Regions:
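Transmembrane beta-strands of outer-membrane beta-barrel pores
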Residues: 5, 39-41, 50-56, 95-97, ...
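Carboxylate/His-rich catalytic cores and anion/metal-binding grooves
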Residues: 34-78, 83
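Outer-membrane beta-barrel translocator domains and adjoining extracellular loop/strand segments
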Residues: 59-63, 112-118, 156-165
């Protein structure tokens, strides 16, 4: 599949649930193209879908103090922002109701008003190892689905108004 997005913010940086796109004043372009396949009667499943982002990243007025702290830079450097990544790519081994694999795709867990409850598509995906159900497992109490993943979330590398900088933190949620 081929996916393109164009976004233009004329006054201030804004963006939410845009994946690898950044909150940006000015023009921003996103493109992704890839291939999906299954081999050996579905035993091996793969998707290669790299992503490219270009943003003008124009200058902004100085921000005020924010209520929430986190890695939310007001501006991603002082130059034009360009980034390419492995995007929504993965490779999995499917056996019965279980899948095991490596992925850089976004993970979204649970419903939410503006984004998923635990994980979302509000940032680029991270590289991770996953063990997950690929279909519901029927039990006498109902059906069960789940996912275990482990990976390392990396700091953006850009300064932001409030909060410390860091080199990453490990992530090992089970849902």
């Amino acid at each position: 599949p081929v996916v393109t997005r164009v976004q233009f913010n004329s006054h201030h940086d804004y963006g939410w649930q845009d994946g690898p796109m950044i909150p940006n004043k000015g023009l921003q372009l996103y493109a992704s193209a890839g291939v999906y396949g299954r081999l050996y009667k579905g035993l091996v499943e793969f998707q290669f879908a790299p992503e490219v982002v270009y943003a003008q990243n124009q200058d902004l007025p100085a921000p005020g103090v924010r209520m929430y702290q986190g890695d939310f830079p007001d501006r991603f450097g002082t130059e034009t922002y360009q980034r390419s990544s492995s995007g929504q790519s993965y490779i999995k081994l499917n056996v019965d109701f279980l899948s095991v694999g490596f992925s850089s795709a976004n993970v979204a867990w649970g419903p939410g008003r503006y984004s998923s409850v635990i994980m979302s598509e509000n940032a680029p995906g991270m590289q991770h190892f996953t063990v997950e159900s690929n279909k519901p497992l029927k039990t006498k109490w109902g059906t069960l689905e789940g996912q275990f993943l482990t990976g390392k979330m990396m700091h953006s590398g850009f300064r932001y108004a409030v909060g410390p900088t860091g080199d990453g933190s490990s992530l090992e949620p089970v849902y």
